Amino acid sequence: MKKYIDEALYEYSKGEVYPFHMPGHKRSFCPETLKNPYEIDITEITGFDNLHHAEGILLEAQKRVAKLYHADKSFYLINGSTAGLLSAISACTSDGGSILMARNCHKAAYHAVYLRRLHAHYLYPAVFEETELNGGITPKAVEEALSVYPEIEAVLITSPSYDGMVSDIAAISEIVHAHQIPLIVDEAHGAHLRFSDTFPESALENGADIVIQSLHKTLPSLTQTALLHTQGSLVSEERLKRFLSIYQSSSPSYVFMSSMDACIRLLESSSEVLFKEYTVRLKECRRKLSELKYLHLVETDEVVGKNGVYDMDCSKIIISTKGTSIDGERLREKLLDKYQLEMEMTAPSYVLALSSVMDSEEGFARLADALLEIDSALDSEMENQMKEKAQTKIEFTDEDAICTIAETMDAEWEEVNLKEAEGRVSTEFAYLYPPGIPCIVPGEMVTKELIEKIESWKMQGLEVQGLIDYHAQKIRVQKR
């Protein structure tokens, strides 16, 4: 029987699956004024302003955002943090210029590099052997790169990372500003940070010039809603506004903007109480999970001060399966099939549960009880060879880059079998999504290690995206 999207969603919403994934409203926050979105879905009619030339109600709404977040200026993003990244990078660089960016940046950053025909230089986070999580970016690495590449026009860091790892933004911003260039921080996963001392400080509090946040990821706002904040004088507001108009829809959704405003109003009036109660629930859940015997809750003190990690966002609940008889994908399946708990992300050796201020006491209890029950049935036997192979890591290096992303993507290509592509120059991205961090970008050479990694991901049942071939059996490479 044919099933339509709206019917499928409605049916799903009536089920028992609990969301430990974004959006941050967790399907439990709906202001009275938003209960019927069709009633408020309008265009730029009299009295309702224009996002691309805000002078009235939308300008005032964005001013309230700036006041709440202590920014000089704040902008609504109705095309998500993707639009913010595209706009920020474009505003801070010249066509054909250079950017220094963390390798674990979101794919939207790479799209900006392509569109602006930039030369990208990468900062590589170290990997924690115990958990296979990416670490942070060190101030020393930033300083060294800026010394080697004085032509760099902007620096882009992701902090917190998808897994909650926070870099030393205060030290990095000081270094970047000494070179008279702006620091852009992709804080898509950190819109909630400033509302509780339980969490790390926001990049806005530590000197970043542009900070991009996804409201919908960790706060009660609709999917696709985000914010861009600016401070200081290193970024041209005129250029930024120009690119925001280019990358954002000319028909911005008033439903989305109403959702953002409702979220901001809630934070203005009740953030102190809401976050106090939330952090109590979160800490109790983490306390229970600290009793796991075989599975392992990744704790803040395990990562902070190591591999470039300055702090960790403990709202991200990371459960490591390393050294047990279960892998990340099988744990995710058990949590969903038996306990009706949907995780945010799975990796070969861990799962990530994303919590938010809207998570209930019951939800946290269900997660803790389920993991403790699964844990009690496990043993600590080492995994078989397939599991060990799946956990082989790739160490990214600059030597694999042959030419720029734009040069490669605009060149002639041919499609070859992935297993026969060693030594060829890729014209495609390849990444696991989530979190969307590329293991190869156009212009880089396909290595034996990369091929083995992709094959192992496929064996684990993980989805490799970015390649035109959805099955990741073929890859497009530069034509000889």
Report the location of each language-model feature.
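Conserved PLP-enzyme active-site core in the AAT-like
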Residues: 5-10, 32, 81-301
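Conserved C-terminal alpha-helix-loop-beta "cap" of PLP-dependent enzymes
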Residues: 284-466
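Charge-dense polyanion-binding interfaces
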Residues: 463-480
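Structural signal for conserved beta-strand scaffold positions within catalytic alpha/beta enzyme cores
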Residues: 76, 122-124, 213, 345, ...
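Short glycine-rich or small-residue beta-strand-to-loop segments that form or flank ligand, phosphate
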Residues: 75-77, 155-158, 318, 352-356
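Short, glycine-/Ser/Thr-/acidic-enriched flexible segments
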Residues: 27, 162, 217-218, 233-235, ...
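Conserved N-terminal alpha-helix of the aminotransferase class I/II PLP-enzyme fold
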Residues: 38-80
